[in-house]
Amino acid sequence: MYILVWKKGQQIKTFHTLDEAAQFKAASNIDEAQMFSVTVAPAISASGGSNEATNLRRLMYLSKSTNPEECNPQFLAEMARVATIRNREIGVSGFLMYSSPFSFQVIEGTDEDLDFLFAKISADPRHERCIVLANGPCTGRMYGDWHMKDSHMDSITTHPAMKTILYQIARSFSSMWSYLPKSAGNMLLLGKDPAAQPPEPMSVVVTFIYLVEFGSILSNPNLTDQAAEVLSTFVDVCVKNVEGSGGNIAKFITGICMAYWPINRTEEALTAIQQISEDLAQLRSQQAPGSAVSLMYSQAGVHYGRPMLCNAGRRKSDFTLLGDCINTTSRIATLAKKFKTPLLFSQEVRCLLRDEMREEIVGAGMHQVKGRDKPVVVYQFPGPELDVEMVRQKIEQFTPGRFRCQMPVVEYEGLPNSQRPPIFDDTPKANRRPRTPGYGGRQRSDSQVDRPIMIAKLAGPSVSATGDTTLTTLTYISQATRPMSRQDLSAIMRTATRRNAQQSITGTLLHVNGLFVQTLEGPKDAVANLYLRVRQDPRQTDVTTVHMAPLQERVYPSEWTLTSATAEMLATFPPLQDVLAQLAKSFTSLETYVPSTVVRHLTAGNNPRNLMPVSCGVVMLATDICSFTSLTEKSSLTEVWMICNTFIDACTSAICQDGREVIKLIGDCVTAYSPGNNADSAVAAAQELFTFCRQLREAFVDVLDVRGCVSCGVGLEYGQVVMAQCGSMGLTEYVVAGAVSARVMEVEAITREVGYAIVVTEPVADRLSPQLRDHGIVPTPQAIEGLPCYGIAGEEFELDVDSIKRGIKALHAARSGEKPLTEPEAAKPDFRVSPGRVRHGDSGRRSNSAQGKRSIQVR
């Protein structure tokens, strides 16, 4: 059932389907409204908060007060008194706890009662952004005697740890919500952990909407400072039309929007994509001279399929669609460029249209696309052509003049250290994690590996011998790996008191029902080193930083303390442990979906909305699974999910070290960046990843398992990128965009042709160490846009794609009981380059000479 709430909660209407709710909203011309999906089951109405009701549900949510100044204990007491009277009548019990400016509330009752009450709560103007922390069935009431008794934090305890911890976790959780994929957000609103959900097959219409020639905009030095504004405009236009037509934004990928609709909204999908083009045309006509928004055009491909909606990855996660139809949609979008049309869609999409719309379309023929054996039949709407070459010429000839945009991009290196956004995770070299392929140890990554140093902009190589002694506070949460007795807690306190006093560290450790929440105060270096030791402690796992920032004066006394919540505070307010445990659990889950730069900026006590758009030079990395379509076309959805999760986790384990960051997870493709002065480290990560794939194949060599056929190629390219925060309509994206983003995908693609698993371009080769540059790379017969490319030398890094393909065919044949086809050995092309062609010095390669470029075959 779906509930539509409008007029600030005064009007509520229920519907059986989402279509009915959307149609009513459109027909009634309702602008500001909220829609909720609920499950209703027959239930006996509760009465008076008694514990005799059946089919009960418990819902916990977090919200932020719109007027925290008036929320004193007296105000909350009166609000709770009124709520108690009203909620007793409908049989709802629970509690309300307030810690400025956040409210934590639990309500218990039947499905029907909670759905009605929560709809009104969500529309209450006294608070905003109601985020569900838990929502599920319960066998009885935990708070039947409380009804809606309030508890202002000042009434519960004066202990500073509780106030600080609740505020820091709630603030970070609330701020990260807008970066969460909508599909994952919907799961959390239903009280479910997205990472724990099994893959769900869906029949959907998928689209890739391209911002035409966005790479040319990025390549034009006169337009670099407007790139963030162009992207933000594109995000807002896509969000408005996609979500306004009943669709869902899957992700944004450097000037590309991936979205999907249920199949019963196919016509709305095509109309929304056309409206995006019309909106951009209107924006172009309204721009002042010199605005790059006047160069924005869209081009899209649409396809129907049955992918699965699932969580991909664990340390770095994405809740998205996976399936062969996603790749086909991307190929159709590429065909739109050839036909000079703003919208191209497949025969499968045409079959979902009604006769009226079918009469409007025209056929565009049958075409072969990459990764698909059968050709695709495509259609388009008649109308004006969209000439991509014309758009490129306009961009190349464009001059902004004196125009000044609202979101100017600044050079990262030109900013003072204190103003630089934390785009790199600057982990101290002395504390590097051991390199282990695959999943590594049991400890999870803390926002992609030990981020506390960069969070507070701790000292780098220029630190003096005594270290940075600036007073700093750090709060983290973790889960105990085993039950902790009073003796265990006493032992922890004795050890911590002795060691921390020597380092001038004060603070508190709170233990709540298996959850550790610790705050440390002291010199920056001492706090950071202690935190890194804590992460290796086998008594706890899932260690996650909540807050780290400079401190004016110490909050805690000189004697370090440990507080057991069950002993003191919970005796006054028992629900407190539920709030802390659930909030910490939800925060840990949410943090893996949010860009690492945003998390570091947020946990340093900053507003992520204030992240400054910057441009800088980085080494870009792109990798994906070889012959992924062939491998998965005859595999089950569960196997596809398993392959992607295994590969993505291996990528994050190899990549997320030494300042490298994962940018996007796109099906089986992973993109990342590394500091421009750390090319050797990027190559080492690529070697680790390819080694993992080889070891994985060896582990399943005698088993009919798809993991026995997993291999990958890795491309590395250097170039300038723009890093900026985009979007203002409820969905926020932190993007890393540049012409290098497209080139690195081409570099990765030629690994299949040249026989090397790792290929780097000349700008990357120039940044390698002398040893690796002169003795570890080999010229390849391919080039990208005139740039010579080089493979990483060594037999262990050769890529035999034909062997991989034969293995995939043999696997599918063995599973189906068929005899695999054999190919004559003479017919097998060999793209491998002899390992003996190792480059020495600069012979055979000249960085900038025309002669050197002409000697390489250009793709």
Curated annotation (Swiss-Prot):
GO BP field: cyclic nucleotide biosynthetic process
GO CC term (a single one): motile cilium
Keyword check for Repeat: yes
Coiled-coil regions listed: none
Entry-linked InterPro entries: A/G_cyclase, Acylphosphatase-like_dom_sf, Adenylyl/Guanylyl_Cyclase_3/4, BLUF_domain, Nucleotide_cyclase
Record bears the keyword Cell membrane: no
One of the record's GO molecular function terms: FAD binding
BLUF domain sequence ranges: 56-149, 471-563
A matching Pfam family: Guanylate_cyc
Compartments, as annotated in UniProt: Cell projection, Cilium, Flagellum
Polar residues bias: start-end ranges: 846-859
PROSITE patterns: BLUF, GUANYLATE_CYCLASE_2
Region: Disordered, residue numbers: 414-449, 813-859
Domain Guanylate cyclase intervals: 205-333, 619-748
Keywords (A to Z) from UniProt: Cell projection, Cilium, Flagellum, Repeat
Family: Belongs to the adenylyl cyclase class-4/guanylyl cyclase family.
Additional comment: The FB strain is deficient in phototaxis. It is not known if this is due to defective adenylate cyclase activity or defective BLUF domains in this protein. In wild-type E.gracilis, photoactivated adenylate cyclase is found in the paraxonemal bodies (PABs). PABs are not visible in all cells in this strain, and are smaller than in wild-type.
Oligomer and partners: Heterotetramer of two alpha and two beta subunits.
Name of the protein this chain belongs to: Photoactivated adenylate cyclase subunit beta-like protein FB
Organism: Euglena gracilis
Encoding gene per record: pacB
